[in-house]
């Protein structure tokens, strides 16, 4: 996906109240921008380092700027906006980049499913294949050279795993897709040290037939796209 106009830049001061971030613009002005990431953002916050943001022309928005990307001290780029993960996944599926998800005739977003009343991120259907339920997760946590998910305890994520398992039991195909929005992550693993219940459930889901995939994003202030498969350590 191309960003038009391309993202503007500044320097990070602080993130607070989950949805707010203070930055310094290139001209030295300090402003508050919207943070579209509700997670802990563990190892994603580097005060003084470069950040990039988009600008909305919607006059009803209190904060016109949205934090999109951050640079680490090592020079890696992190995609802060978790909302872009689904769009990156959809674009990659349509382009045939995710080879494991090729061959479907229809793609729908946010379809209701499961006994716990969730909405699947992507539902792929085809007359010749079983329905494929794809749950998308953004992976941005890098610790000691290893990529992890989640970055905080996620009961919602646990619910999604249970419902993917339910789809497999019903004869459908179920896929957990990690969209890796950190250029320094080269493999993904369940963060047992952060959410042991999620790690245990992921292992159970995989054993029952839920497929676990990860694809890495190439990112810049101009564009972003999923470009290659990333190993998942189960």
Swiss-Prot record:
Listed GO MF terms: DNA binding
List the InterPro entries hit by this protein, alphabetically: SfsA, SfsA_C, SfsA_N
Which Pfam families does the record associate with it?
Answer: SfsA, SfsA_N
Listed CDD domains = SfsA-like_bacterial (cd22359)
Family as reported in the entry's similarity comment: Belongs to the SfsA family.
Q: What is this protein called?
A: Sugar fermentation stimulation protein homolog
């Amino acid at each position: 996906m191309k960003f038009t106009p391309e993202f503007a830049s500044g320097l990070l001061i602080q993130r607070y109240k989950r949805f707010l971030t203070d930055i310094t613009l290139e001209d030295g002005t300090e402003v508050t921008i919207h943070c579209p990431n509700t997670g802990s953002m563990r190892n994603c916050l580097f005060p003084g380092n470069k950040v990039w943001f988009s600008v909305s022309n919607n006059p009803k928005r209190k904060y016109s700027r949205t934090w999109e990307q951050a640079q680490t001290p090592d020079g890696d780029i992190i995609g802060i906006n978790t909302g872009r993960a689904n769009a990156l996944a959809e674009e990659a599926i349509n382009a045939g980049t995710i080879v494991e998800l090729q061959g479907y005739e229809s793609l729908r977003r946010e379809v209701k499913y499961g006994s716990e009343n969730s909405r699947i991120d992507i539902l792929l259907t085809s007359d010749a294949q079983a329905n494929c339920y794809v749950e998308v997760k953004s992976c941005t946590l890098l610790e000691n050279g290893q990529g992890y998910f989640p970055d905080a305890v996620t009961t919602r994520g646990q619910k999604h795993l249970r419902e993917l398992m339910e789809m497999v039991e019903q004869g459908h195909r179920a896929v957990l897709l990690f969209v890796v929005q950190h250029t320094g992550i080269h493999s993904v693993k369940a963060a047992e040290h952060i959410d042991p219940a999620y790690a245990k459930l992921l292992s159970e889901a995989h054993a029952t037939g839920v497929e676990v995939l990860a694809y890495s994003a190439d990112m810049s202030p101009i564009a972003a796209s999923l470009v290659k498969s990333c190993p998942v350590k189960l």
